[in-house]
UniProtKB/Swiss-Prot annotation:
Keywords of this entry: Disulfide bond, Glycoprotein, Secreted, Signal, Vasoactive, Vasoconstrictor
Secreted is among the record's keywords: yes
Function description: Essential component of the renin-angiotensin system (RAS), a potent regulator of blood pressure, body fluid and electrolyte homeostasis.
Lineage: Eukaryota, Metazoa, Chordata, Craniata, Vertebrata
Organism: Callithrix jacchus (White-tufted-ear marmoset)
Family annotation (Pfam families): Serpin
Record-given protein name: Angiotensinogen
PANTHER family: ANGIOTENSINOGEN, SERINE PROTEASE INHIBITOR, SERPIN
Disulfide linkage: 42-162
Family per similarity comment: Belongs to the serpin family.
BP GO terms, sorted: positive regulation of epithelial to mesenchymal transition; regulation of apoptotic process; regulation of systemic arterial blood pressure by renin-angiotensin; vasoconstriction
Cellular compartments annotated: Secreted
């Protein structure tokens, strides 16, 4: 590893260690200087706001209007270009934002998993989408709403001083950098093991005006921002169907935007859509579906992937679970966490998906493994209003939002959603060194044919991209 990269890794690990000690069970950690306004930017803001004219606005096109399709390849190329231009400070800022997203999402996940534990399906959470959505709302927020959003993002607003305020543009740019660092890996060799696309949908009532600087700022995080208008007042189910048809038409993704529970007088739905596709090197799709045991007496037939290689692995005899690290690239990996007994899934989830859970990665060691696991195609949506309430964080996404930087209209937020389309598939090219058939030691047969947990993690960026629970691969909740 080059010296500069090693220095960055050491700095990040020191920040993580310090933050873990300082944070304890609290959500909030120290506001790192890389993500807040400095004195020079505060002076520029003061000058810009002095005698500043009203921000230009526009009315989103009707959702029925013809739209150009989203070019996912172009989105990936743009992320790769972003990653190539990052300097050392940019990478450290990206790591800092990734760490903040990890802390927030572990807290949300640990509280919300109590609800998920009662559901026999598959659930998935995107730390980057959660953090990115809240940061996007912060970009459009003013006064008490901005204050409370900043606190939830992990950077308390100490006083009225500008230099303690989160810089939304820095945060959103850092989130795009985190995405770019993931998809840029292995591109030099012409390989594309990972695809990650983020699209923001801004759905408004007819006649509502959005401010152009806000929408332009969102492009720092998600290059594809789709503002559209439609009627929410007559039938929310019909409105949800229109949104879903529109998104499938422009992206090709079959995802849902559930509006159940939203008020009929809502005039804004904010949805962050994420598509992830990971190709597992040296794995192949088995010819026939295999049994997956949902519980001791119930099984379902699911497509399975199979691969053999030398993977990082650890089995905890005391708490009775195992962890296997399957590489996507040199830095990015899939972490598979399986209880020794299916009935212990909730217990193992509580042990592993928490703020200091990545400490057990130091215990992993090479092991020859023949791994069989479900081919995952997961689609799920969740409402951040529900997640924040479950996590006992301030309920700030309701009717009292101050979003003056987003619109001059009185915004009534119906839903703040994240919709995830997650795919794991086989990459049946020639096996790489880590996935070639092992020689020598006895091969461990590892079959994930009962409930398990997973995470997508980048070791260099110390960023978690997805946290998931699979109790039944055929059902997403």
């Amino acid at each position: 590893m080059p010296p500069a990269s090693m220095s960055l890794r050491v700095t990040i690990l020191c920040l993580l260690a310090w933050a873990g000690l300082a944070a304890g069970d609290r959500v909030y950690i120290h506001p790192f200087h890389l993500v807040i306004h400095n004195e020079s930017t505060c002076e520029e803001l003061a000058k810009a706001n002095a005698g500043k004219p009203e921000d230009p606005t526009f009315t989103p096109a009707l959702i029925q209007a013809k739209s150009l399709p989203v070019d996912e390849k172009a989105l990936q190329d743009q992320l790769v270009l972003v990653a190539a231009k990052l300097n050392a400070e940019d990478k450290l800022r990206a790591a800092t934002v990734g760490m903040l997203a990890n802390f927030l999402s572990f807290h949300i996940y640990s509280m919300h998993s109590e609800l998920w534990g009662m559901v026999q399906g598959a659930t998935i959470l995107s730390p980057m989408a959660v953090f990115g959505t809240l940061a996007s709302l912060y970009l459009g927020a003013s006064n008490h709403t901005a204050y409370r959003l900043q606190a939830i993002l992990g950077v308390p607003w100490k006083d009225e001083n500008c230099t303690s305020r989160l810089d939304a543009h820095k945060v959103l740019s850092a989130l795009q950098a985190v995405q770019g660092l993931l998809v840029a890996q292995d591109r030099a060799e012409g390989q594309t093991q990972l695809l990650l696309s983020t699209v923001v949908g801004l759905f408004t009532a007819p006649g509502l005006h959005l401010k152009q600087p806000f929408v332009q700022g969102l492009a720092l995080y998600a290059p594809a921002v789709l503002p559209r208008s439609l009627d929410f007042s007559t039938d929310l189910d019909v409105a949800a169907e229109k949104i879903d048809r529109f998104m499938q038409a422009v992206t090709g993704w079959k995802v849902s935007s559930p509006l159940t529970g939203a008020s009929a007088d809502s005039n804004l739905v904010f949805n962050t859509y994420v598509h992830f596709q990971g190709k597992m090197k040296g794995f192949s799709l088995l010819a026939e579906p295999q049994e997956f045991w949902v519980d001791n007496s119930t099984s379902v037939s699911v497509p399975m992937l199979s691969g053999m290689g030398t993977f990082q692995h650890w089995s905890d005899a005391q708490d009775k679970f195992s962890v296997t690290q399957v590489p996507f690239t040199e830095s990015a990996c899939l972490l598979l966490i399986q209880p020794h007994y299916a009935s212990d899934l909730d217990k193992v989830e509580g042990l592993t998906f928490q703020q200091n859970s990545l400490n057990w990665m130091n215990k992993l060691s090479p092991r020859a493994i023949h791994l069989t696991m479900p081919r995952l195609v997961l689609r799920g949506s969740y409402d951040l209003q529900d997640l924040l309430a479950q996590a006992e964080l301030p309920t700030i996404l309701g009717t009292e939002l101050n979003l003056q930087k987003m619109s001059n209209n009185n915004l009534r937020v119906g839903k703040v959603l994240n919709s995830i389309f997650f795919e794991l598939e086989a990459d049946e090219k020639e096996p790489t060194e880590s996935t070639q058939q092992p020689k020598g030691p006895e091969v461990l047969e590892l079959n994930l044919n009962h409930p398990f947990l997973f995470a997508v993690y980048d070791q260099d960026a110390t960023a978690l991209y997805f946290l998931g629970r699979v109790a039944n691969p055929l059902t997403t909740v």
